Regions:
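Helix-loop-helix
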Residues: 186-200, 270-343, 348-349
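ABC-type nucleotide-binding domain
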Residues: 357-358, 364-612
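Transmembrane helices of ABC transporter permease
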Residues: 39, 43-56, 101, 168-222, ...
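An intracellular "coupling" helix at the cytosolic face of ABC transporter transmembrane type-1 domains
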Residues: 39, 140-141, 159-166, 170, ...
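Juxtamembrane loop-to-helix connectors within ABC transporter transmembrane domains
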Residues: 20, 29, 37, 116, ...
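Alpha-helical segments in transporter systems
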Residues: 34, 42-67, 98, 113-117, ...
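Transmembrane helix-loop-helix hairpins at lipid-water interfaces of multipass membrane proteins
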Residues: 44-108, 189-193, 304-308
Length: 612
């Protein structure tokens, strides 16, 4: 399970993202994030104003509280000396004013938090929407070389990490720097000498922060990356758990998962360890400054240079001064997490897209469905060509069968026909027009597909059949189901056509899934049909019934059929026999048997197996 074999149509290169991903571009990622945030600048301006206002009111508190302390101390001294007592009325006024400041600060803090949450959620919504739209524009090669879980991790884990860390870090950046500046001003107004002593802790703090951030940066990156790998493995194994059990591969799967999970554990442990180190180290450094200021303040009070209330205010300011420094360390940590998640999201959004529109698009209206392969060369990698100089002309209404052993290039031909991949050289033509001259969406509307891997979504049977033609009436849906010989089966189900299929459509059999996908293709009424192992998952009796229905459907339409059971394509107008990417034989069934070549060998070997 360690390597994925292409996409749902098979073929394609192996792949997956590894640990060799490019190094983090922290500054570039933050610039991109700021560009996104600039669209919410009005909200961010209000966040800035309310955060600054809340912080300023909070900063003023210790200074005012110091006045109350001074008033109490003066009153006590006066009472001892017999001159006067404590002025409780004045103290009450000071405390009421102080309470009003703190209440206002709390209200401002609530408002800025409310606005910032809205901004971060709007950004999250936008990024999820862009990723969802981006997925539909991505080339098939991207999904053939990555696990589903890795892509899903960008939409879920990375976006959630970005939203949460942004919501916290943006506000803390504002409040931390405002607090540092405001507290510094208040400290200088009380005592420049005490301020100088308090500032001596800064070089130590900054040095420790810088060291820890540098060490934690790469671990946060690895944590996000391998979280995607773990999700991909879980999704892959869960989707194929029956196969895993059938081949007794539980131990191998667990071993592979443990290896990836171990890397994730180590990265997460180290990143969280360094993150957790910041707070106790910064608190220790802050306490050193606190002790130094307390000693100096007592000395200055004895010298009557400052008042007792100023000492209390200054000590509280020292505590408030070290707290935002600690918060800056936490913000630096969160910014690393934000940048790591943002980079993965932006990397996905900046992936190369398919060209959806041609410069001078050809209209699909009135096209008949003649197809020509003109000396086609193709390889998933430029240095490994798997289709060499393939040429064939298919007239409208013909039934074309493509046969050959596994890996011969049969499914690849279909991918090229639908422009999931572009040819390396020469061209594929429809009614004389190069496929590249069509808009991709309009081109694919010409095709109806019944794939080997049936795909049905969570919804009613009626909705699944109607997927090929959303404006189809209920009567048209039923007629398509009858043509696919699935109508009688649907009638036996609870709620009939309104029965809900579960997430993996496991409440119907594989053969019934195949019939429903055939009904969907019939309803779409395409000009060109692609049948990839269309009847390989049903019993012989059902296969015969489906074959008759498909013969009626294919009459008058260009049809491409990929099948390993050669008995199903004996009436094909043209059979292309592929081996190692080349067409080595072509003709109808009788002609190919007379040639007594590779096709005859394949056909006779299947006949012998059937007889045995």
């Amino acid at each position: 399970m360690s390597k994925r074999q292409g996409g749902p149509m098979g073929g394609g290169p192996h792949g997956g993202m590894g640990a060799g991903e490019k190094a983090k571009d922290f500054k570039g990622t933050i610039r991109k994030l700021m560009k996104y945030l600039s669209e919410y600048k009005i909200g961010l301006i209000f966040v800035l104003l309310f955060a600054i206002g809340s912080t300023i009111f909070n900063i003023a508190g210790p200074k005012i509280l110091g006045k109350a302390t001074t008033e109490i101390f003066t009153g006590l001294v006066g009472k001892v000396s017999g001159s006067s007592g404590i002025d409780f009325e004045k103290i009450a006024h000071i405390l009421i004013f102080l309470m009003c400041l703190y209440v206002t600060s709390a209200i401002f803090s609530f408002i800025q938090g409310y606005i910032m949450t809205g901004v971060s959620q709007k950004l999250t919504y936008r990024l999820r929407k862009e990723i969802s739209e981006k997925i539909n524009r991505m080339p098939m090669n991207y999904f053939d070389t990555r696990t589903h879980g890795e892509v899903l991790s960008r939409v879920t884990n990375d976006i959630d990490t970005l939203s949460q860390s942004l919501n916290q870090s943006a506000t803390q950046i504002i409040t931390s720097f405002t607090t540092i500046i405001g507290v510094l001003i208040m400290m200088l107004s009380i005592s420049p000498l005490m301020t100088l002593v308090a500032l001596l802790i800064l070089p130590i703090s900054l040095g420790l922060i810088s060291t820890i951030v540098k060490r934690s940066q790469r671990h946060f990156k690895n944590q996000q990356e391998y979280l995607g790998h773990v999700n991909g493995q879980v999704e892959e194994v869960y989707g194929g758990h029956n196969i895993v059990k059938a081949f007794n591969k539980e131990a191998d799967v667990i071993k592979e998962f443990d290896e990836t999970n171990e890397i994730l554990y180590q990265s997460a442990w180290k990143s969280q360890f360094f993150s957790g180190m910041m707070m106790p180290i910064m608190q220790f450094v802050g306490n050193l400054g606190y002790v130094a200021v307390a000693i100096l303040g007592g000395y200055l009070a004895i010298k009557k240079t400052i008042e007792v209330g100023d000492i209390q205010s200054f000590i509280q300011y020292v505590r408030n001064f070290t707290q935002p420094i600690t918060q800056v360390a936490q913000v630096a940590n969160m910014l690393q997490s934000t940048a790591a998640a943002s980079e993965r999201v932006f990397e996905f959004l900046e992936e190369e897209e398919e060209d959806q529109f041609a410069q001078n698009p050809v209209s699909v209206e009135g096209l008949e469905g003649n197809v020509e392969f003109d000396h086609v060369h193709f390889g998933y990698n430029a240095d490994k060509i798997i289709i060499n100089d393939f040429s064939a002309k298919v007239k409208q209404g013909q039934k074309i069968a493509i046969v050959g052993p596994t890996g011969a290039g049969k499914t690849t031909m279909i991918k090229l026909l639908m422009r999931f991949y572009d040819v390396n050289s020469c061209a594929i033509l429809i009614d004389g027009h190069n496929l590249k001259d069509f808009n991709r969406g309009e081109l694919r509307q010409m095709f109806g597909m019944v794939l080997q891997d049936t795909w049905l979504f969570h919804g009613s049977i009626k909705e699944n059949i109607r997927y090929g033609k959303l404006d189809a009436t209920d009567e048209e849906v039923i007629e398509a189901a009858k043509a696919a010989h699935v109508h009688r089966f649907v009638q036996t189900l609870p709620n009939g056509y309104d029965m809900e299929l579960n997430e993996e459509a496991s409440n119907v059999s594989q053969g019934q899934k195949q019939l429903l996908t055939i009904a969907r293709a019939i309803l779409a009424d395409p000009k060109i049909l692609i049948l990839d192992e269309a009847t390989s998952s049903v019993d012989t009796r059902t296969e015969v019934r489906i074959q008759k229905a498909m013969d009626n459907l294919m009459r008058g339409r260009t049809s491409f059929i990929i099948a390993h059971r050669l008995s199903t394509i004996r009436d094909a107008d043209l059979i292309l026999v592929m081996k190692d990417g080349d067409i080595i034989e072509q003709g109808n069934h009788e002609e190919l048997l007379k040639q007594n070549g590779f096709y005859a060998e394949l056909y006779n070997s299947q006949f012998e197996k059937t007889s045995a």
